[in-house]
């Protein structure tokens, strides 16, 4: 699935407060007929984003890696030896983080990621290049992992249309499908983390999560841009 804002690397170092800053501000000049104003603003913001710079320095696939790092720093979700499924894995930052923290290796892979977009190989990660919404996807994920997961993570977001309510509804649908999958495969005591957009229509999703998990949290990590409507739902301690 495509990601809003570019997505998802490592140890828990480099989390909260670790993005750094620079006094150098890059401005993108607009030449007539070459670039839309909205595209120019996005590119300028991207070039001046401290998380983008830090992700390159730290060797993470994307700035979204810090979102998972920061959430994990707060809730201690990832532990050595766990098995993880990453939905909408491209470009691989969340799988990268998960594999390093849980100790996944090529000889004993404990992380499986899926995306219809190509993801370059990652150490310790099995990557499936297919749409999670395909009927065969859930079974292929379970076959690849070989056991029930301890954690299902999803940074999926539908391609944006520019219409806020439409984008919200499409992403909530992905969250609902991911949640249905999680409650059908998680180990008792497992956790589910998914991206959603603020918009007030996720009542059914929240009701499902509150029924199936012992606690549900709304989380906005510091790496999420302040102006972004993205939000994360964390459902902890699956009742089984």
Swiss-Prot record:
InterPro entries noted in UniProt: RNA_methyltr_RlmE, RNA_MeTrfase_FtsJ_dom, rRNA-MeTfrase_E, SAM-dependent_MTases_sf
Active site residues according to the UniProt entry: 195 (proton acceptor)
**Which Enzyme Commission number(s) are listed?**
2.1.1.166
Q: Where is this region: Disordered?
A: 1-33
Identification of the protein by name: Ribosomal RNA large subunit methyltransferase E
- Report the source organism: Brucella canis (strain ATCC 23365 / NCTC 10854 / RM-666)
- Residues holding S-adenosyl-L-methionine: 92, 94, 115, 131, 155
The UniProt family comment states: Belongs to the class I-like SAM-binding methyltransferase superfamily. RNA methyltransferase RlmE family.
């Amino acid at each position: 699935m495509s990601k809003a804002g570019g997505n998802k690397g490592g140890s828990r170092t480099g989390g909260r407060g670790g993005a750094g800053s620079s006094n150098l501000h890059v401005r993108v000049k607009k030449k007539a007929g070459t670039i839309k104003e909205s595209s120019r603003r996005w590119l300028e913001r991207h070039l001046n984003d401290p998380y983008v710079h830090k992700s390159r320095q730290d060797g993470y696939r994307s700035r979204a890696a810090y979102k998972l790092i920061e959430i994990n720093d707060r809730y201690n979700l990832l532990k050595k030896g766990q098995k993880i499924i990453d939905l909408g894995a491209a470009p691989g930052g969340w799988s990268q983080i998960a594999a390093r923290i849980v100790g996944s290796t090529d000889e004993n892979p404990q992380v499986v990621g899926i995306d219809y977009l190509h993801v370059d190989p990652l150490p310790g990660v099995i990557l499936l290049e297919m749409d999670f919404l395909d009927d065969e996807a859930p079974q292929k994920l379970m076959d690849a992992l070989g056991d029930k997961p301890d954690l299902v993570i999803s940074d999926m977001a539908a391609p944006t249309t520019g219409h806020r309510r439409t984008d919200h509804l499409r992403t909530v649908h992905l969250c609902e499908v991911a949640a249905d999958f999680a409650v059908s495969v998680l180990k008792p005591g497992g956790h589910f983390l998914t991206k959603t957009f603020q918009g007030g229509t996720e009542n059914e999703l929240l009701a499902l999560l509150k029924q199936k998990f012992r606690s549900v949290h709304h989380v906005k990590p510091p790496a999420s841009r302040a102006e972004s409507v993205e939000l994360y739902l964390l459902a902890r301690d699956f009742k089984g």
